[in-house]
Amino acid sequence: MNINIVTIGKLKEKYLKQGIEEYTKRLSAYAKIDIIELPDEKAPENLSDQDMKIIKDKEGDRILSKISPDAHVIALAIEGKMKTSEELADTIDKLATYGKSKVTFVIGGSLGLSDTVMKRADEKLSFSKMTFPHQLMRLILVEQIYRAFRINRGEPYHK
């Protein structure tokens, strides 16, 4: 399986980079994983609703340009469906079973995802009703993908 994580913004924190590198290394035994970082749009100090829409649309266009037409797209969004680790594992297992070898997870910038990205998403996933920094979300997502593969293989880790 090929898994892409398309995300807005550059990761700066060393501890997050190290955590993500560790989990992507572990994941290499199960799947090919690529993290595609796209630049965030510079925002003016006092954002109007129109400014926010313009920024999200520009970031959304960048995101959509990196998504393969045949990819199953999972957008991370606070209004998405919450799943347990086992349910995420089941989702990944079913995608593999039904021949969906390309899965793309999308993490938006600080303003969220554009309407066009949300429409392109095959499903929307929420990790919590709380808001997390999008940089931290990368680490949480990669760990959960790793956990899902371990669960699907019946390997110890997830308890």
From Swiss-Prot:
The lineage of its organism: Bacteria, Bacillati, Bacillota, Bacilli, Bacillales. GO terms for cellular component: cytoplasm. This is Ribosomal RNA large subunit methyltransferase H. Its EC number is 2.1.1.177. Belongs to the RNA methyltransferase RlmH family. Keywords: Cytoplasm, Methyltransferase, rRNA processing, S-adenosyl-L-methionine, Transferase. It is found in: Cytoplasm. The gene is rlmH. It comes from Bacillus subtilis (strain 168). Its main location: cytoplasm.
